[in-house]
């Protein structure tokens, strides 16, 4: 069996994207252990479609179909509900989709916060419509959390849902010199890629100020870090 895995979530079409590629590589390596062949690609290298930041890719599907004809997969696995998935459905290839979170809540939150203008709200609506077409016509949706099944069924009643368990491969861990922490301290391990979640870090402004003898360390990064760091870095006990 041959599985084509397309990485798109988290990276988008921005230059230098990383997305969730690393985790999908580990998934593919696990498939190889049960004698399943896989090919992992960045989906935006082959097709983008509308709406996206790459107008040149709105109408071109040649790279996508060249990939399909060359690799001839038995099934396709994607982590982004976009045009790669839609074209897979049109090509008649079994499609499986990986859903990491509450997509509908994330879209509504984005409309109320960072994408309030009409243009971006329209883009979000189009992307959500594409995603729902993918969910409706795919062979299965893999979820990272049990609660998502009820969420998905609320919007896509006939969806076929499967639980996808993620794990850590400790053989990949390696020792590294740590930083010297000043005590007492609090460690924050969280990314800054979803604004409706990331904005909660701003409540630390008053907390850090009220606890000058406690050091706060943030281990994280993301597209909204520049909205958070200017607020928190003014405190000498934030690192």
Predicted regions and their residues:
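Conserved donor-binding/catalytic core segment of Leloir-type glycosyltransferases
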Residues: 4, 177-201, 205-209, 217
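Acceptor-binding helix/loop patch of EC 2.4 sugar-transfer enzymes
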Residues: 47-50, 97-129
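N-terminal subdomain of nucleotide-sugar transferases
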Residues: 1-44, 206-209
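Nucleotide-activated donor-binding/catalytic signature segment of Leloir-type glycosyltransferases, i.e.
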Residues: 218, 226-239
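Membrane-proximal helix-turn-helix segments that form the acceptor-binding/catalytic region
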Residues: 62, 66, 118-141
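Short N-terminal targeting/anchoring amphipathic segment
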Residues: 66-83, 88
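A short, charged, and often flexible helix/loop element on the N-terminal side
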Residues: 40-67, 115-120
């Amino acid at each position: 069996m041959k599985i084509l895995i397309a990485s798109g979530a988290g990276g988008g079409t921005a230059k230098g994207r990383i997305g969730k590629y690393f985790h999908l590589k580990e998934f593919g390596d696990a498939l190889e252990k049960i004698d399943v062949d896989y090919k992992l690609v960045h989906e935006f290298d082959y097709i983008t479609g509308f709406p996206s930041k790459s107008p040149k890719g709105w109408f071109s599907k040649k790279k996508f179909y060249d990939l399909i004809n060359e690799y001839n997969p038995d099934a396709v696995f994607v982590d982004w509900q976009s045009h790669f998935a839609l074209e897979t459905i049109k090509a008649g290839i079994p499609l499986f989709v990986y859903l990491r979170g509450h997509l509908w809540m994330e879209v509504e939150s984005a409309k109320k916060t960072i994408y309030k203008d009409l243009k971006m709200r329209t883009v979000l609506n189009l992307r959500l419509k594409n995603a729902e077409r993918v969910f409706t016509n795919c062979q299965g949706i893999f979820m990272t959390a049990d609660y998502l099944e009820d969420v998905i069924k609320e919007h896509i009643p006939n969806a076929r849902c499967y639980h996808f368990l993620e794990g850590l491969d400790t053989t990949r861990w390696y020792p590294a010199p740590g930083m010297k922490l000043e005590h007492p301290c609090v460690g924050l391990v969280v990314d800054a890629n979803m604004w409706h979640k990331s904005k909660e870090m701003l409540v630390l402004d008053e907390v850090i100020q009220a606890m000058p003898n406690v050091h706060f360390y943030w281990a994280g990064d993301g597209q909204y870090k520049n909205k958070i760091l200017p607020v928190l870095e003014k405190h000498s006990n934030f690192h």
